Amino acid sequence: PNGFTYALVNVPNSTFPNTTFNLQVKEKDSDNRAVQSSFRSLWIDMPRSLLSLDVAIDMLRYITDEETIDRLSSGSQRERERKFRDFWGEKDPTPKTEYNELMAEYYRRVDYSYENFTTENTIGYNSDQGEIYIKYGPPDNIQRKYPTEGATVEIWTYPNRNFVFEATSGFGDFRLKSN
């Protein structure tokens, strides 16, 4: 009606990366008329730390060696993105889908560390608490002790492991004391 034709096109979204695409539709047996439109494949709850490739690569320091980080950091933006995707692709528990659960969880932990452990002196994912949270996830239990003498102590409990942090400033800065 009114010169419009509607068509449903099955687009397998699970195979598209988080980016913008152009879709061009040509009418068959016409004067080569074409309609072009942009669409975006969007990861709605993408961790913010993945918005910066530099940050995303830097945060790998908790799970890989410096040589790998140097390799991922070299090259053009496109090459670095490809190498970054390849790095996580090798670790993807569901490689036939675009969504990588392991990568998503890792960078959610990076975001959490930024939001919860950042102080005036330290970005949260660079803090001792941030590092432990990124590596091990949320602790099973957190206990905070306020001794009458000495600094506040926070104990994070994981299966078969405890991490003890000691306050250094009274403003949320904690340093790993023992594990």
Predicted regions and their residues:
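Residues within mature, well-folded domains
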Residues: P1-L8, N13-N18, N32-N179
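Short, conserved beta-strand segments of beta-strand-rich sandwich/propeller modules, principally
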Residues: N18-Q24
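Beta-strand-rich extracellular modules
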Residues: K26-S30
